[in-house]
UniProtKB/Swiss-Prot annotation:
Region annotation RNA binding: where it falls in the sequence: 253-259, 277-281
Residues noted as binding Zn(2+) in the record, renumbered to the chain: 310, 312, 315, 341
GO BP term, pick one: tRNA-guanine transglycosylation
GO MF terms, alphabetically ordered: metal ion binding; tRNA-guanosine(34) queuine transglycosylase activity
Designated name of the protein: Queuine tRNA-ribosyltransferase
Gene: tgt
Catalytic activity line of the entry: 7-aminomethyl-7-carbaguanine + guanosine(34) in tRNA = 7-aminomethyl-7-carbaguanosine(34) in tRNA + guanine
Subunit composition and interactions: Homodimer. Within each dimer, one monomer is responsible for RNA recognition and catalysis, while the other monomer binds to the replacement base PreQ1.
Species: Shouchella clausii (strain KSM-K16)
Residue sites binding substrate per the record: 95-99, 149, 195, 222
Length: 383
């Protein structure tokens, strides 16, 4: 039986150790390292599937928790699965819903069986278990599914984190058993999630537990939750080597330009984040010269593009002054333009990262990019 998800290693950058590869899925092949736009409710906010294809998005992420609540998995099942429902014929990754249960619901009770919580929209009592998270994702029909994990708060003490890691490992085993029982493991790949916070011994314990289960891919969870960037990079330095070299490695919830480059240097293949779409709706844009808040008054008569060096449709067509006007008036078209540009910027950045790995010069690329973006300045504004 052919595995649903396989990883093909192409090259390691001699200068940085970053990996160039391909992830093969039932809906196509993805070049890595890569960034995944987030389509929480079966849509990347303000973008059409045609927009996403035009900017060369290879895969999108959707959210199990939100789709379970609205419209419900039964409606998506009637549509023929998530790909059919949203008219997207490329790969989809779905998260397990764990992060949302822990971040959106104030009233929750963690038991060995799963998590009891209240629907953040209606207040209705709900229960999500590893098995239920798998069953919903089977109906959604995503190419890559994520195991249901416990998402501990940051910071958390060692004893709390150890108990959490051990529960996540037991839940991962249950997820895998349910996935195999369903018979869907030939058409959907299930990734395990390594937890452990900033504790090296717990990351090692989590990685050992999960790699023993032989998932087709592995994610690093519990980062980008408020810790400083240098802590995240340090955790990646001791966690990534614990992950199999012949499987994809996914850093969850990371999407700032510096973190994408630094993550790739530390051996990560896949990234996702709501950052580019969320900040776009506030009029904040990523450009080759750094962060640009287009709603600011100084752009009222600025008829240049958002980014002189960007060749996206928005930068070729519209001015800062026009986009500022739209954003100030809360016109949806303005949010659409800034969203398109930000997503294009990150997808194009990852193309440049892949080329730099091919050319064995990713550290040189990082130095030049950081200098132009302004990351090297004292008190540099990040996202």
């Amino acid at each position: 039986m052919t595995a649903a998800i396989t990883y093909e290693h192409i090259k390691t950058c001699k200068q940085s150790g970053a990996r160039l590869g391909r992830v093969h899925t039932p809906h196509g092949t993805i070049e890595t390292p890569m960034f995944m736009p987030v389509g929480t409710l079966a849509t990347v906010k303000t973008m059409s599937p045609e927009d996403l294809k035009a900017m060369d998005a290879q895969i999108i992420l959707s959210n199990t928790y939100h789709l379970w609540l609205r419209p419900g998995e039964e409606i998506i099942k009637e549509a023929g699965g998530l790909h059919q429902f949203m008219n997207w014929d490329k790969p989809i990754l779905t998260d397990s819903g764990g992060f949302q249960v822990f971040s959106l619901s104030d009233l929750r009770k963690i038991t060995e069986e799963g998590v009891h919580f209240r629907n953040h929209l209606s207040g209705e009592k709900l229960f999500l278990s590893p098995e239920k998270a798998m069953q919903i994702q089977h109906v959604l029909g995503s190419d890559i599914m994520m195991a249901f994990d416990e998402c501990p708060p940051y910071p958390a003490d060692h004893s709390y984190m150890k108990a959490s890691v051990e529960r996540t490992s037991r839940w991962a085993e249950r997820c895998l058993a349910e996935h195999k029982r369903s018979g869907k493991d030939s058409v959907q790949g299930l990734f395990g999630i390594i937890q452990g916070g900033e504790y090296e011994d717990l990351r090692k314990q989590s990685a050992n537990d999960l790699t023993a289960l032989d998932f087709p891919g592995y994610a690093v969870g519990g980062l980008s939750v408020g810790e400083p960037k240098d802590v995240m990079n340090h955790v990646l330095e001791f966690t990534t080597p614990l992950m199999p070299e012949d499987k994809p490695r996914y850093l969850m919830g990371v999407g700032s330009p510096d973190s994408l480059i630094d993550g790739a240097i530390r051996g990560i293949d896949m990234f996702d984040c709501v950052l580019p779409t969320r900040i776009a709706r506030n009029g904040t844009c990523m450009t080759s010269a750094g962060r640009l808040v287009v709603r600011n008054a100084k752009y009222a008569r600025d008829f240049s593009p958002l980014d002189e060096k960007c060749d996206c449709h928005v930068c070729r067509t519209y001015s800062r002054a026009y986009i500022r006007h739209l954003i100030k008036c809360e016109e949806t078209f303005g949010f659409r333009l800034t969203t398109y540009h930000n997503l294009y910027f990150l997808l194009n950045l990852m193309k440049q990262v892949r080329q730099a790995i091919m050319d064995d010069c990713l550290l040189d690329f990082r130095e030049q990019f950081f200098e132009e973006y302004g990351f090297n300045k004292e008190n540099a504004r990040n996202f």
